[in-house]
Structure formats: C-alpha cells, structure tokens
C-alpha cells in the first residue's frame, strides 16, 4: 500500500514534526583506525587560532609553548583565542556584584568536598591514560598502578585514602629527579605443541623495572592521550577527544566541583541539571524576557553556535578566573585549585597509535608509530598528511605534541559555562547603559541569547555588542551558524522551544529495543523506557501500546522465546513447548519462558515477575526464584538497578529500573581471548582488586558500610569487624566456643603476618 507521507502530518502541529527531520534512527557512525590525524588537526588548528601570541620554551620539558593571552585585539569574523585578562576579571567582578556572596559560598562548599573526598573518586570514569604503561586503561587499574609506583618511590601520603593526600604525592613526584616504574612486556617463543606436533607461538607476560628521568616523567604526567570520538551523528568528519592521566584528574575534579557549585546558583546555566529540571530553568528565563518586553519592546532570540569553543579557550584564562573566585580564601585551597589550569597550560597531546601503511604490491603492512613522525621522510605521505606533519613537527617531543593553548573536549565544562554566563550577565540594563538589554542560557559551548530593544536597530546593536564582548574573553560566536528568530522559537541543547518545549521524540529512538544484558534486565529496561517516554516525551497511549507490542516481538526474536503454542521453530522451541504443556496456569509463565505478554500501558511500572506471581504454578515459582537454585544470580542484586541508556546524542543517561533476581538474571562470562594477550597481567591485577573489594563487602554489608575514617587499612578494618561479629555471635549462642576461638586465632595470625611483612 502506498502512503502519501504528507497525510501523516495533516493533524500534527508543524513544531511537533521536527522529530522526523533528525538523523537518529539506525546505527551511528564509528571510527576505525588511528586518531593520529584528527589529533594533529586539533593541535594545528588550536595553534592557528592563537598564532599571534608569544612563543616561550618550558624550562623543564623543553616544549615550545604559545601564549595568546592579552594578544592583539581580535578581528571580526575570524575565530581567535586572544582573551584579555582584565576583561575576564571584570566579567567575574560583575558576576559577583549581581550575585552577592556566590563565590564565597561556593568556595566554602568546595573546601568541605576537598577535605572529604576519598581517592577512590578517581576510579569512576572509563578509559584513563595510564602513564606507567603509556596507554589507556580502565580508571581503577590506572589509579592502582599509579599508587603502586608512588609507593615504590617512597611517596606514601595516599595511604590515608584522601584524594588531597594523593594529590600531595603527585606534587612531590614532580620534584623527584627520577621515578622507577614497572612496565609489562611480552615475550614470544616458538614451541612444539605436544598434541598436534605443530609449531605454535607462545606468549608470556613479564614485568620489568624501568627508570624515568624528571623530564620524561613530567612529559608523561602532563600528557593527555587522544582517541577518536565515536558515534557522532550528523558529521562528516570525526574528531579527537582527550583522556587525561591520573596526575591531572584529581585537580580537574576539584576545579569542576567549585565551578559546578557556582553553576547551580546561576539561573542562566544549563549545567549541571538535566531533563525536565533544565527545561523548567530555561522556561523561566524566557518567561522573564517575554513579560518584560511589554508592547513597546521587541524581543528576539538567537539560537547560538560558537566556533571551536574548546580550541579558543585558554587554561591561563581559567587560572585568572580561579584566582579571582578564590581571592580571600586560605592559601592551600587557592594553590590546589590553581594546579589544574597550570598543568593544562603545559599539557602535551599524545598523538595516538600513528599511521598504518600498506603496500598493495608486496602485500605488506607496517605501522609508523607516532614517535617516528618527527624524523621519518615525508615522501611516503600524501599531500594533506605531509602538511599536517610539517606543521606539527616543531611541537613534537617523544611522540607527544606540546599544546599549551586550547582546552581539549570535555575537560572544564562547568568552568567554561561560568565564563559564558558572566557575559550573559552583562546584558542587564545597568551594565549596557542603553535601551537594549539581553539575557540567555549557557551550557558548555551551547547558548541561546535573548535580546530586547525598542526597535530593530536596537536589537542589532545589542547582538553586535554581545558578539564583541564575547570576543574579548575568547568566545567566538559563529555568525554563519547562529540564527535569530522572534522570541518564542529557538533551540538550546537539542531542546526545541516553541511557546513551550516540544518533545523531540526522535532523540529517544535509539534507546527503544532490547538492550542485551539478560532476559530479566532487558524486559525491565524495555518497559521502563516506554513508561519514561510517556511521562517525559509526549509518547501518546496508542503509540506507546504499539511500541510495547513491537518491543515484545523484538524481545521474543532476540531470546528465541516465542509463545509455547506458536508454530515458529527455533532452537529453544522444543524445551519451551514441553514447559508450556506441563504448566497448569499458562498465564503465569514469563515471556522469556514462552509465556503470554500481560503488559499494557497501565502496568508498565510493575516488574514482570510481580505482575505474574499470583498466576504462577507453585513449582514454577520455586524454580524461578529459589535462592538455592544455582542459576539464580545473586550478584548483589538491589531492588533497583541502573541501566545506561544512550539517547541519540548528548551524554549517556542513567536510568533506574526494577530488578528482581530470578533464573533469568544471568551474567555473561568474560571473553577468554583476552587471556592470551599482553592485557593478561592487567586482568589478573583487576581480578585481585575485585576479590579484595568483594571480601571487604562481605565484612561490611552495605547497610552498615560507612567509609573508613582515619588511617586503618582495609585488612585492619576487616579483622576488627570479624572480632566484634564473632563476639556477638558467640554471646548470643549462634556459634560454638570452638568456632569462636578459631576465628580469634585466624585474626591473630593475619595480624602477625602483617607485622612480619
């Protein structure tokens, strides 16, 4: 049947059709190969935007550095990083004047956080540049390796477990003349396989000690590793993102804590809130501008776009901001916050894996690592790559490029938002001292600007003034990509506003479907996504009902669990039919056991097991939820789990769903192929780490688990806990005298062993 697509929209208001224009169905593009080229682009562009700055050489590392601050006044239309310090400081002063006490209060809040944060905060986050192995690692492993190296080099402040003490170690490590590190390496040897009598390559992993001098260590500590940003929609070119190492992470965390605390108090900031809370905040600003623009005033809104936000920001500017924000605060606090921007002013960008060469004729492939780019003959490269390498060569040291200006993506989102809001704040009439005035919203590099004035000339003048003010602090509004409309229609961080926010439903499309965790979680997540979209995204009842039917169908095909009375033949149908025939109450079978679907849009909030519990046969209940059944996973299943939901763009969202432990909550095993690679040593470290944590949690069930205070180690805490528990159990008669004395003996032995060590 042919459908005329225009018929679909006859009853739909135009603004609701925005969803259909988004490129958000289907798989997003992923990058393959190395990010070296993208990283070189970033480095070269960043220097180009600041090219009229002053060149200096870092005395410790010998890296050439470009400083554009207080450089020439920026030119029109060309993006540039020449921020003027006095302008930034003045913007900060006016921001404080409009919000009395804001900086003071945020500093006090942050000081409290600084004193309480444990070093395990750094284990959050995914990939981290591990400077000891010179490549990316999971955050927890990278932290463990760093602490291990610090310890073997006589730095022990971090034993107390406070992040601030770990940062003291980082500072001390930078003064050391040399550091000794442990690296992993691979040995290959050819041996004859006893079974097949063929020759095979056997790999063994070794650890070796290596000394690193001060200069090399500093370069590693200041290095940001780079990767290609994956899954970016609507772009032809990929771009590079940075993963900083452990030395930088802690300092950045404290700066962002301070900035977050400031953003929470600013009505123009789109961070750190999200979702409906963010929409409410935005709607308030719009309402304020609409009500104040009485009949005499015009009100226009710019949907703004900034050119290369990160590459024109400058860490030196952030240092100036922090110095101002923390003026009157204790010296130690000011020092600890100023280290992150100082490290970023001296940062090095690691160029990634390098280039891969193929000779079609000789069927050869070879990799040119980034370290070789400084010396290799350029005749092997094509024109554009040659230009990139020539440009970057003066900046190269040991396969990393000196990158003083610019910020790299996603490092100081909150602090850069504070800078943006400080310019929006200058739009009040008392500062513009004329008939036009402005306000707006800022969320990292995205902004919306609302300008009010008596006539069109006033609007134009207001926009021009805003544009020029931004230029003075290194923000470059793009005249090509920003557009202006009567207030009431604009877009900000993918929220479309048209006299109220329009649900951009297409953004949520990728999160519909089967997640692939396990049968239990997938069912729960699937219905929760539909429920949430009915609440938040205008998903109507009829569409929701259809989405539900499609989901159930998808789910049955994924897990091959078609109804027991179906004609569809799959690998599981024999077992499921047998179960169907011997079940008295067929409605009680879970969908994943070939049962019928009892969900409709009224009961999406109830986990399937609970929905069908009363309908189940008794023996089926017993199998499904029996804690003695070896297939019921008891990996600390809470009553609420978190799923990571990927919207079409924007950060991954965490979504809560109800989790009921059944035979269907299985956990897939780790892929074994990792065991044959150089990652194996790391995997063993990780498992050791995991075992220790699990053991610790056995002693301290989550209800009674408070973070250890003071300097007792995990072992001491567990031993003292074991003694207390044993005494209570013995006195209440739960354990016999022999068991009690055996526990005491074990505790004593552990303490003895620790002393001898």
Swiss-Prot record:
Residues 50-82 are annotated as: Disordered. Keywords: Eukaryotic host gene expression shutoff by virus, Eukaryotic host transcription shutoff by virus, Host cytoplasm, Host gene expression shutoff by virus, Host nucleus, Host-virus interaction, Inhibition of host RNA polymerase II by virus, Nucleotide-binding, Nucleotidyltransferase, Phosphoprotein, RNA-directed RNA polymerase, Transferase, Viral RNA replication, Viral transcription. It is found in: Host nucleus; Host cytoplasm. Residues 286-483 form the RdRp catalytic domain. It comes from the Viruses. The keyword Protease does not apply. InterPro entries: RNA-dir_pol_NSvirus (IPR007099), RNA_pol_PB1_influenza (IPR001407). Pfam families: Flu_PB1. GO terms for cellular component: host cell cytoplasm; host cell nucleus. Residues 249-256 are annotated as: Promoter-binding site. A motif (Nuclear localization signal) lies at residues 187-195, 203-216. This is RNA-directed RNA polymerase catalytic subunit. It comes from Influenza A virus (strain A/Memphis/110/1976 H3N2). The gene is PB1.
